[in-house]
């Protein structure tokens, strides 16, 4: 932990020494954001909305680039292309460090300050990023597993809809460690209907499964709720999902889902742009990862966000927000 913090601080000092300040720093700044998820997904839409808001407020230019599908090679090419343009800053998600290491390190070597978001909490410093804005995926999974166990779950599914995304692997690993029961990692397609069918089939084959963790609200969380709803009242299956959508918040408020794990994606888009602006204009920046989650959202909080009454109170609806587990100074 200390080594990571020292590495982050050292990288920041080196970049500041190379960049300098003055009139050039006051020119209109241009940043590029490369992520592995598109704005068609509510999670990434919130990130883009936050980044666009920060850019508008700060008077800077922001260009967003995303592969057409989850394609690590294509994403690496986008990072390389962005670095070649020598932007004032690069914001990037890191779903797989091995696949993106060369491109990100190349950007850093070219003198482009890099901030990672969403995926990459545990590897950002080693790749030369100034810091990461997001959450520890392992810790978030562990918090979810522990809470699911408290709610009475004994046998669970962890739905992985994006094979090759190491951050999702870490979520499932944390969930397994926190749950301390039987957990099956179930690979599913990144298509909601296919997810619903896969969950339905698995639940019908194994009547002992009483908990499901989805790693995306829109791709897997909603379909998991639909699959369990179709089982009727004769069986209790607890559902939790990473991230929030209106449908998931309604499901949590109605106690069809136990809780959601919120990592505040708007902040993951907004803060990096503002931090890069501050870096150029004031020469200041965080010296460690910036935590935006995890926060567990239960029925009361979900209803509040929707502006509606929560369902009748039960033990499973009373999920209180939690603080992230400390794994690194300045991080979640």
Language model features by range: what are they?
Residues 102-139, 243-254, 258:
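Flexible loop/hinge segments that line or gate small-molecule binding clefts
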Residues 9-19:
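Bacterial N-terminal signal peptides
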Residues 131-156, 193-196, 244-248, 264-281:
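Hydrophobic alpha-helical segments within soluble ligand-binding/sensing domains
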Residues 30-54, 58, 63-79, 85, ...:
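Extracytoplasmic "Venus flytrap"
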Residues 42-57, 140-144, 166-183, 198, ...:
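Short, solvent-exposed amphipathic alpha-helices that sit
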Residues 56-69, 157-158, 175-196, 211:
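Short beta-strand elements in bilobed, periplasmic/extracellular small-molecule ligand-binding domains
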Residues 92-108, 175, 184, 189-250:
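Hydrophobic alpha-helical
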Residues 27, 179, 267-332:
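Hinge/cleft segment of the Venus flytrap/periplasmic-binding protein
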């Amino acid at each position: 932990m200390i080594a990571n913090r020292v590495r982050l601080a050292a990288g920041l000092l080196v970049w500041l020494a190379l960049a300098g300040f003055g009139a050039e720093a006051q020119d209109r700044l241009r940043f590029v954001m490369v992520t592995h998820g598109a704005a068609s997904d509510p999670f990434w839409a919130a990130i883009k909305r936050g980044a666009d808001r920060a850019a508008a407020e700060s008077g800077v230019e922001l260009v967003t680039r995303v592969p057409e599908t989850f394609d690590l090679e294509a994403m690496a090419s986008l990072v390389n292309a962005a670095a070649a343009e020598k932007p004032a800053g690069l914001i990037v998600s890191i779903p797989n460090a091995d696949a993106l290491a060369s491109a990100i390190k190349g950007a850093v070597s070219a003198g482009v300050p890099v901030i990672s978001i969403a995926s990459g909490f545990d590897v950002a410093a080693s790749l030369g990023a100034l810091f990461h804005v997001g959450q520890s995926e392992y810790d978030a999974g562990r918090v979810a597993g522990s809470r699911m166990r408290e709610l009475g779950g004994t046998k669970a599914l962890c739905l992985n809809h994006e094979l090759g995304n190491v951050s999702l692997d870490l979520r499932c690993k944390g969930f397994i460690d926190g749950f301390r029961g039987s957990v099956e990692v179930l690979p599913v397609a990144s298509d909601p209907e296919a997810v619903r069918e896969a969950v339905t089939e698995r639940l019908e084959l194994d009547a002992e499964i009483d908990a499901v963790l989805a790693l995306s609200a829109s791709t897997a969380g909603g379909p998991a709720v639909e699959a369990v709803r179709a089982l009727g009242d004769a069986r209790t299956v607890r559902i939790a999902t990473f991230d929030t959508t209106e449908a998931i918040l309604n499901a949590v408020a109605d106690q069809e889902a136990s809780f959601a794990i919120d990592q505040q994606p708007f902040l993951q888009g907004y803060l990096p742009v503002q931090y890069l602006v501050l870096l150029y204009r004031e020469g200041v920046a965080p010296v460690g990862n910036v935590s935006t989650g995890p926060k567990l959202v239960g029925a009361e909080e979900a209803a509040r966000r929707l502006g509606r009454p929560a369902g009748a109170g039960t033990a499973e609806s009373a999920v209180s927000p939690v603080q992230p587990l400390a794994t690194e100074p300045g991080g979640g």
